[in-house]
Amino acid sequence: MSDEIRASHILVDIKSRSKEEAKTAIKKIISDLNDGNDFAELAREHSDCPSGSDGGDLGRFGKGAMVPEFEKAAFDLEIGSTSDAVETSFGYHLIHRTE
């Protein structure tokens, strides 16, 4: 397994909405992805992270750079695949591993 990966994500935060609203929003984004919508475009439209303007691209990162729940999910993904919703202290993430 590589020491570094590259991934993009979509964050639906729990600072600006309730946890239930965030769950509903992330489920809608998952549905849009399953309908064939582009991950980067959905990140630009819906992500609460500044990386959203870059299609959710987080660049390359190694272990220890992200919160544990995010890191585990990202490193467990196959290249080209997208996670289910991952809950962290920031909210709900969809992670797409690109490298």
Please give the residue ranges for each predicted region.
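Glycine-centered tight-turn and secondary-structure capping sites
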Residues: 35-40, 80
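Soluble sensory domains of the PAS superfamily and closely related sensory modules
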Residues: 74-78
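Charged low-complexity stretches with an acidic bias
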Residues: 67, 79-83
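Well-structured core secondary-structure elements of compact alpha/beta domains
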Residues: 1-34, 50-65, 95-99
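FKBP-type peptidyl-prolyl cis-trans isomerase
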Residues: 6-14, 39-47, 70-73, 84-99
